[in-house]
Amino acid sequence: MFLATAMGVSAQTQQVTVVELHPAPGQFVNTLPAATAETTHEEVCEAATESLADEELIHLGTYGGYITVQFDHPVQNKKGSDFRILGNGFYAASDPVYGSETIGGSFEPGIVYVGVGDDVNTCKWYELAGSEYYTSEIHDFSITYHKPTAESGDHKQPFSTFDNYIKWEATWTAKDGTKRDSTGYHMKTSFHKQTYWPLWEEGETLTFKGGKLPNNAIEQSGKGSYWVLYRYAKDAYGYADASLNKDQYSTFDIDWAVDEQGNHVDLAEINYIKVVTGIFQYCGWLGETSTEVAGFVDLHLVPGYDDDPIIIPVKQRPTGVASVRADGKDDVRYYDLTGRRVVNPTRGIYISNGKKIMIK
């Protein structure tokens, strides 16, 4: 032990350090972890580090909010999945449409990025291309949230204490190349009375840019009371808080890394992991869809893992247009060129399984 210490060598552990925590507004901001008006960014990162050590939840807020962590060692890129991210996703006990076969419940997918470099401020970031990357993900979504000027106000929506609580403005490019923009408000619910604005952030606005995943919630009661948040498919992969912690789809392969043009990048190891809330969605009384994380695991430190690693089949980048018949009986999901799912496709061009499909 003396020799190892003298040489500057230390054992690798599963302990992570939170180096950045910048949630977007959300119902559990300032509570997971706790923060006050006097809390600094450094202090909230320390609190988040302690929470993750105990596998307690960290709330990232609505779209764009993120956390960045670092192990006490680089994570190696070896065969199969390289690390696991814990969340709080679960399946619905009673799905009125799909019953026990449901792939829905509470799944709030976060996009995962990996960083290479010695400094979080200057490292090179790469997105891990999940199952929706080449089909329905929007890659240039930008949103600005405005700090609320009051914590209560006019409210007519159910379970609201302030309908026009936090103003937001968003821009993006649709799949057909059309430039889009939208403006609206997040309401404040009666269930969480603290401010939803992160108290350690300076300034009057927060802006987030990056990939955005398609909405995944369906209100199944017809009365606004029962929201089900679905996985994109049984074999959907590549997103945090989007599957059960124990299954293979909560693991991530560094080989999924792509550059800004969606091209594969070979990485020997990574130094940082960033998780970003990937959906911009509001579900009535349930509130915003917000990714939560509860831990990170370097799989290569798990005894015996490398002898039988998890290998997840991936969707390839579309290379052309295939042709199928409109009366096909195959159980395949189709999306239009804006990323919206089409249940009964007619003649035209769609995206399916990562490829452009022409239905005649």
Annotate each predicted stretch with a short phrase.
Residues 1-13:
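Bacterial Sec-dependent N-terminal signal peptides
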Residues 12-108, 130-317:
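A domain-level signal for the mature, folded cores of soluble proteins
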Residues 111-113, 333:
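Beta-strand signatures of extracellular beta-sandwich domains
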Residues 115-120:
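Short loop/turn segments immediately following beta-strands, especially the blade-tip
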Residues 121-128:
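Tryptophan-centered short beta-strand motifs
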Residues 312-338:
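Residue-level detector of functionally pivotal "anchor" positions at catalytic/ligand-binding pockets or at interdomain
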Residues 349-360:
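C-terminal tail/sorting-segment detector
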